[in-house]
């Protein structure tokens, strides 16, 4: 079961969900836990709304639910050209580093006290903050990969593992299309593919013409 948590404090949830009658999610999650139902959580972080003290309270509430919470992913808010009603801050390098500091602190607590990392930052946070992405062992069973957690690390591993199975393509020209965020990470993979196949690879970076240039993930 995957649950979009975003925040546990009621006042923050009312703003985030634009619903003055939003139910108490801690009560709802507690009911799941008492019923023996485990779940993964996702929190889309909007700077100024559910980071800082709100985030700390949210993670503390989730921590108190014990083994019912299998993992939590922190993902930066995506602001598109259609977000006309949104007047909050976008995620930048400074905010991303602060979020990763929080992730690492709670993850280390989980490892020390429960043997489980349990809180993860999305790949986009690492890219925004220019921090190196963790290795395969960091992500366990990759339970949050659909939320963009560990996707780049998994891709790198799958490319390396599959090189020996690729056919020779000497003289072929192949274009690889990706988004803005992935562009700096692709040359090392294209070099591996070129050496394994003999093909000539060209990297094509595309801006998102549907959601706008602030949407940079591929």
Question: Model segments located where?
Answer:
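Conserved AdoMet/S-adenosylmethionine-binding subsite of the radical SAM
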Residues: 1-114, 138, 146-159
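Phenylalanine-focused residue identity feature
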Residues: 39, 82, 120, 139-142, ...
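A structural preference for short, hydrophobic beta-strand core positions in alpha/beta folds
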Residues: 41, 74, 121, 203-205
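Short, conserved secondary-structure transition motifs
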Residues: 79-83, 125-130, 211-215
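Short glycine/threonine-rich loop-to-helix capping motif typified by GTGT followed
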Residues: 86-90, 133, 213-217
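Hard-cation-handling environments
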Residues: 99-178, 193-196
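Redox- and metal-dependent alpha/beta enzyme cores, enriched for Fe-S-associated oxidoreductases
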Residues: 164-217
């Amino acid at each position: 079961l995957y649950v979009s948590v975003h925040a546990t404090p009621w006042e923050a949830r009312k703003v985030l969900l634009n619903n003055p009658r939003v139910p108490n999610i801690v009560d709802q999650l507690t009911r799941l836990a008492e019923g023996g139902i485990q779940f993964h959580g996702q929190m889309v972080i909007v700077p100024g709304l559910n980071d800082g003290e709100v985030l700390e309270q949210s993670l503390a509430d989730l921590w108190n639910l014990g083994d019912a919470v299998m993992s939590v992913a922190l993902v930066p808010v995506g602001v598109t050209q259609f977000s006309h009603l949104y007047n909050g801050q976008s995620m930048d390098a400074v905010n991303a580093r602060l979020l990763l500091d929080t992730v690492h602190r709670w993850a280390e607590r989980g490892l020390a006290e429960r043997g489980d990392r349990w809180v993860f930052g999305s790949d986009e946070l690492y890219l925004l903050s220019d921090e190196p992405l963790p290795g395969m062992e960091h992500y366990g069973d990759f339970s949050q990969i659909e939320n963009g957690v560990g996707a780049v690390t998994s891709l790198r591993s799958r490319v390396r593992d599959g090189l020996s199975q690729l056919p020779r393509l000497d003289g072929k020209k192949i274009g690889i299309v990706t988004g803005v965020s992935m562009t700096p990470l692709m040359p090392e993979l294209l070099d591996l593919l070129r050496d394994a196949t003999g093909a000539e690879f060209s990297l094509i970076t595309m801006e998102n013409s549907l959601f706008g240039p602030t949407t940079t993930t591929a």
